Amino acid sequence: MALWGGRFSQAADQRFKQFNDSLRFDYRLAEQDIIGSVAWSKALVTVGVLNADEQQQLEQALSVLLEEVQANPHAILASDAEDIHSWVETKLIDKVGDLGKKLHTGRSRNDQVATDLKLWCKFQITELQTAVQQLQQALVMTAEANQDAVMPGYTHLQRAQPVTFAHWCLAYVEMLSRDESRLQDTLKRLDVSPLGCGALAGTAYAIDREQLAGWLGFASATRNSLDSVSDRDHVLELLSDASIGMVHLSRFAEDLIFFNSGEAAFVDLSDRVTSGSSLMPQKKNPDALELIRGKCGRVQGALTGMTMTLKGLPLAYNKDMQEDKEGLFDALNTWLDCLHMAALVLDGIQVKRPRCKEAAEQGYANATELADYLVAKGVPFREAHHIVGEAVVEAIRQGKALEALALSDLQQFSSVIGDDVYPILALQSCLDKRVAKGGVSPQQVASAIAEAKARLF
């Protein structure tokens, strides 16, 4: 039975009902709807709509219903109820009779669904923060185990300067720290309760909304009823958080896909996160990483879709807002799954140190060290930069590394170059010099790992 049938003389066309109903996806708000209903029943006692005995009956019935939902949430989908609010109310009436019909007094589905969704978002943020931290922990442990794994760092996908695999891992720890910070910021803004705002103008009952917000675990109550029932900023913010987070995971995946390729061959991925080819028996494909990269697009699409849904809506509630859930549910589930999968990829990854070092020694990644050497000898940096460029051209012509050039070859570009240049051009020297905070020197990387462990474990 619909919650709004008295005004209508004809039943809804079945095609419209299927188009209009939202139970198939908003059933996921069942627990939140029941929790909100328990709090609302307490509020109705304070204004004399319910007495204490009636409230206890309702709360007990709702508690039983909550247990049933937790045991088998998908059983809800067997109902032909319009939405989760209708389903909960119908089940409550089945349990307590006409008393259940009193619960919706002073409440609208507009403030009800806004409350349900915020409660769900709060729980989901906690889950996401946990998953972010678990991936950070996996990255830190991988970094700690690979502090001595020297590899090329890249700009423009060209070998640039030597780094370590540990330093690479720690870069993603920083990105994930920003993801967690954004989630925390989102939580602060959504932690206000819209319950008691009615359809748009506020409830006609003198309910203490601050007390009601406290019962539900919100920091406070919202300040304007029109805004409260139409606000979906938290949906946009969470979708934005997810979109940025998925961009980070997509970059992580792309890096490892390249590192795992035959062209780089820096890492081996575990058999547990790879698959084969139906035709080519030699293949070991990085499917987990490719799916992480691929799923980034659907999350970006959810953000774009929700932005377009909201952009032209007048105050206050409009049915368009029913479209706020499917994209949000899918995007946050996708982000959560990808966070877990990224951590699984790191569990069992093998860094191929000899190959990494070999690649770091190629591509003239120590050219900047030669420029710095010249600067230390009194050559202006811009001039030193030009000199080293010429030296690299000569090394390429001879098919040698910079450090393999004879001293006489180097001195044709600058007379200040002496025998002391060769230790400077050594791979380890390139790392050791990066001692400023955030640099790739062994001591800085070790310090960053220690700081991250203290913060995350």
From Swiss-Prot:
Pfam families with a match to the protein in the record: ASL_C2 (PF14698), Lyase_1 (PF00206)
Keyword Lyase: yes
Subcellular location, record wording: Cytoplasm
Keywords, sorted A to Z: Amino-acid biosynthesis, Arginine biosynthesis, Cytoplasm, Lyase
InterPro entries cross-referenced by the UniProt entry: Arg_succ_lyase_C, Argininosuccinate_lyase, Fumarase/histidase_N, Fumarate_lyase_CS, Fumarate_lyase_fam, Fumarate_lyase_N, L-Aspartase-like
Reactions mediated catalytically: 2-(N(omega)-L-arginino)succinate = fumarate + L-arginine
Gene3D superfamilies: Fumarase/aspartase (C-terminal domain) (1.10.40.30), Fumarase/aspartase (Central domain) (1.20.200.10), Fumarase/aspartase (N-terminal domain) (1.10.275.10)
GO biological process annotation, one example: L-arginine biosynthetic process
Main location: cytoplasm
GO molecular function, one term: argininosuccinate lyase activity
The protein's annotated pathway: Amino-acid biosynthesis; L-arginine biosynthesis; L-arginine from L-ornithine and carbamoyl phosphate: step 3/3
EC numbers on record: 4.3.2.1
Signal peptide (residue range): none
Recorded GO CC terms: cytosol
Family named by the database record: Belongs to the lyase 1 family. Argininosuccinate lyase subfamily.
NCBIfam families xref list: argH (TIGR00838), PRK12308.1 (NF008964)
PANTHER family, per database record: ARGININOSUCCINATE LYASE
HAMAP family for this protein: Arg_succ_lyase (MF_00006)
Protein name: Argininosuccinate lyase
The organism of origin for this protein: Yersinia pseudotuberculosis serotype IB (strain PB1/+)
Lineage: Bacteria, Pseudomonadati, Pseudomonadota, Gammaproteobacteria, Enterobacterales
